[in-house]
């Protein structure tokens, strides 16, 4: 084995020289240069600095503006809450531990950090799935006369929390476990060992299939069908400028959504699966650290894509930030009036996130 396994930890370094120490008790500067820990702390500070305001602003603006309190926006609020879970439960902890060079908060802190980071990430992931399904149901109309209402939104919220809990809770109660990973300053599911009594193998297979592959398939299916529906509508109305513009807007939005989804989750899932299927192989601490923090950056991508690209929310946000007046409202209003010169069966409001 090209690593050192101990009680509730796995260090990706063979202890031939005797320098490997528990990540709960000693700085891990023998793994990488101390400057790397400083860089990690600075990166987490950046995520906190950007992630907290944009997600808090999402909650505040929605509460302040009654017209934003729509059933679909419940899911967007859920997304913001999930991101705040990651900010407070994961980012602040990792920033603090990276400043010390090891997981100074001990086993309890590792469990809490791993749980909140996993819970927040999974709530966000399944919220994106609910959004994708809602867009597919409304635009493609597989069920005629379907209208997304408050009851549907509540069921969607319940599903996101249920699925997230089904992923984050088991390691706390003995099905797998949370251990320090990468540079040993943050905690995640144990992909690294076959520790007796924890059934890591079955949990990793379950997590990869049910909490990565299934969401990925659903998102690709829903947005793929959505894009086809817009193209079909545009082909049926070749002279409709509004429809052509809607097609371009939806195409851009879908491409950005899919790319962001893959950038956030595919590197982490791929590396975790490789480590799991090649246990005992040699890899460095940075090998798992970089993908893990790509996934954490979803707390910034999500609100930018799913909320800031929503014109109605953007106008309300500008109004709030500018103390009740939107300096761009008149210009946008004129543009909106000009764009409504021709009716269309598919409009940008029908295919935007909200």
Curated annotation (Swiss-Prot):
One of its GO terms (biological process) is G protein-coupled opsin signaling pathway. PANTHER family: OPSIN (PTHR24240). The chain crosses the membrane at residues 37-61, 74-96, 111-133, 153-173, 203-224, 253-274, 287-308. GO terms for cellular component: membrane; photoreceptor disc membrane; plasma membrane. Phosphorylated on some or all of the serine and threonine residues present in the C-terminal region. InterPro entries: GPCR_opsins, GPCR_Rhodpsn, GPCR_Rhodpsn_7TM, Opsin, Retinal_BS, Rhodopsin, Rhodopsin_N. Residues 329-354 are annotated as: Disordered. Residues 334-354 have a biased composition (Low complexity). Glycans are attached at residues 2, 15, 200. It is found in: Membrane; Cell projection, Cilium, Photoreceptor outer segment. A motif ('Ionic lock' involved in activated form stabilization) lies at residues 134-136. It comes from the Eukaryota. Keywords: Cell projection, Chromophore, Disulfide bond, G-protein coupled receptor, Glycoprotein, Lipoprotein, Membrane, Palmitate, Phosphoprotein, Photoreceptor protein, Receptor, Retinal protein, Sensory transduction, Transducer, Transmembrane, Transmembrane helix, Vision. Residues 62-73, 134-152, 225-252, 309-354 are cytoplasmic. It comes from Mullus surmuletus (Striped red mullet). This is Rhodopsin. Disulfide bonds join 110-187. Photoreceptor required for image-forming vision at low light intensity. While most salt water fish species use retinal as chromophore, most freshwater fish use 3-dehydroretinal, or a mixture of retinal and 3-dehydroretinal. Light-induced isomerization of 11-cis to all-trans retinal triggers a conformational change that activates signaling via G-proteins. Subsequent receptor phosphorylation mediates displacement of the bound G-protein alpha subunit by arrestin and terminates signaling. Residues 1-36, 97-110, 174-202, 275-286 are extracellular. A lipid is attached at residues 322-323 (S-palmitoyl cysteine). CDD domains: 7tmA_MWS_opsin. It is a multi-pass membrane protein.
């Amino acid at each position: 084995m090209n690593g050192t396994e101990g009680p509730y930890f796995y260090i990706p370094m063979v202890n031939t020289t005797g320098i490997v120490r528990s990540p709960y008790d000693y700085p891990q500067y023998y793994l990488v240069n101390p400057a790397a820990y400083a860089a990690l702390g600075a990166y987490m500070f950046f995520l906190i600095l950007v992630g907290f305001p944009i997600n808090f602003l999402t909650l505040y603006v929605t509460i302040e503006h009654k017209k934003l309190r729509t059933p679909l926006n419940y899911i967007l609020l859920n997304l913001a809450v999930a991101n705040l879970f990651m900010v407070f439960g994961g980012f602040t902890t990792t920033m603090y531990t990276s400043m010390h060079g090891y997981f100074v908060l001990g086993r309890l802190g590792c469990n809490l950090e791993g749980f909140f980071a996993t819970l927040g990430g999974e709530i966000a992931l399944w919220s994106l799935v609910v959004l994708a399904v809602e867009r597919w149901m409304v635009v493609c109309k597989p069920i005629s006369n379907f209208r997304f209402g408050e009851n549907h939104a509540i069921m969607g919220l319940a599903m996101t929390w249920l699925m997230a809990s089904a992923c984050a809770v088991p390691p706390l109660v003995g099905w797998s476990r949370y251990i320090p990973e990468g540079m040993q300053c943050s905690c995640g599911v144990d992909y690294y060992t076959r520790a007796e009594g924890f059934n890591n193998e079955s949990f990793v297979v379950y997590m990869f299939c049910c909490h990565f592959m299934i969401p990925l398939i659903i998102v690709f299916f829903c947005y793929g069908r959505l894009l086809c529906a817009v193209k079909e509508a545009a082909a049926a109305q070749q002279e409709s400028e509004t429809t052509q513009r809607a097609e371009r807007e939806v195409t851009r939005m879908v491409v950005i959504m899919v790319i962001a989804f893959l950038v956030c989750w595919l590197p982490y899932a791929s590396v975790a699966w490789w480590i799991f299927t090649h246990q005992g192989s040699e890899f460095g601490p940075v090998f798992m650290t970089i993908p893990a923090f790509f996934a954490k950056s979803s707390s910034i991508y999500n609100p930018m894509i799913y909320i800031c690209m929503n014109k109605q929310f953007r106008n309300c946000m500008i109004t709030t930030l500018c103390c009740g007046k939107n300096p761009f409202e008149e210009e946008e209003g004129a543009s909106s009036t000009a764009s409504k010169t021709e009716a269309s069966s598919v409009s940008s409001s029908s295919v935007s996130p909200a």
